[in-house]
Every structure is written in C-alpha cells, then in structure tokens.
UniProtKB/Swiss-Prot annotation:
This is Nucleoside diphosphate kinase. Coiled coil: none annotated. It catalyses: a 2'-deoxyribonucleoside 5'-diphosphate + ATP = a 2'-deoxyribonucleoside 5'-triphosphate + ADP; a ribonucleoside 5'-diphosphate + ATP = a ribonucleoside 5'-triphosphate + ADP. The keyword S-adenosyl-L-methionine does not apply. The active site is at 117 (pros-phosphohistidine intermediate). The gene is ndk.
Length: 140
C-alpha cells in the first residue's frame, strides 16, 4: 500500500455540534494520522474558489453559503491509501445511503450538512491540501 495524504474538512454542521474530537477519533481508529489541522472560517471568496469545480451546478450558491456559515476544521490526513480509506470512513455523500458506522451515517444532518468533505483522488488531494496549507504546516 502507498502512503498518501488527503484533505479533510469538518464542516460547519459538525463544528457547531462539537463533533471534531469524535470525527478525529474515527480517522485515527482507521489508521490515519492527522499531520496538519486548523480551525478557520471560510470567506465567500475562499469557498467559491475551493468549490469552483461546481460553479455551474444548481447547488453551488447553497454550498458556498453553508460552508461560510460557521467555522470548519481543515486537516491533512496521512496513511496507507489515505484517499480511499478516508472516503470509506466518511460514507456516502447522502447520509441516508451511508453505511452504519461511517461519519455521515452517524453525524450528518442531511445531504448538504453531511459533516465532512474529503478529497476524491490523489491528484485533487494535492491541490486541495495546497489550497489550505503551506508545506511547513504539515508535520508528518
């Protein structure tokens, strides 16, 4: 297995309910290490840039509004096959379809307020990590 890094964002619905520690425990229990982490409040410009791939989608404005509605925790997770492992831990985007024991099955409120974001591939993970972190902020 290849050691990888992936980006995770604990979304405003989860930070509002003080779930950061419980979500981090799930990452660590699955063998992922948190090698960088910071709590921030995304600006509208940051959210629009980060989610720019969805700009033409009907849900874009709502997504930007939600992601700027409260603090988020951005973090870099590291481990064997980190991208796939994180996606498995998160569960399906729609929490009604998420497997029991996944973050979204356990904590998500709905398809938008689904508690976490995770990179979908190694190349996007590298781009997403660079969006939020300078190399010196990642301590492996």
């Amino acid at each position: 297995m290849a050691t990888e890094r992936t980006l995770s964002i604990i979304k405003p619905d989860a930070t509002r309910r003080n779930l950061t520690g419980r979500i981090n425990a799930k990452f660590e229990e699955a063998g992922l290490r948190i090698v960088a982490q910071k709590r921030i409040r995304l600006t509208k410009d940051q959210a629009e840039a980060f989610y720019g791939v969805h700009k033409e989608r009907p849900f874009f404005a709502g997504l930007v509004s939600f992601m700027t509605s409260g603090p988020v925790v951005v973090q870099v997770l590291e481990g064997d096959d980190a991208v796939a492992r994180n996606r498995a831990i998160m569960g399906a985007t729609d929490p009604r379809k998420a497997e029991a024991g996944t973050i979204r099955a356990e904590f998500a409120e709905d398809i938008e307020a689904n508690s976490v974001h995770g990179s979908d591939a190694a190349d996007t993970a590298a781009q997403e990590i660079a969006f939020f972190f300078a190399g010196v902020e990642i301590v492996g």
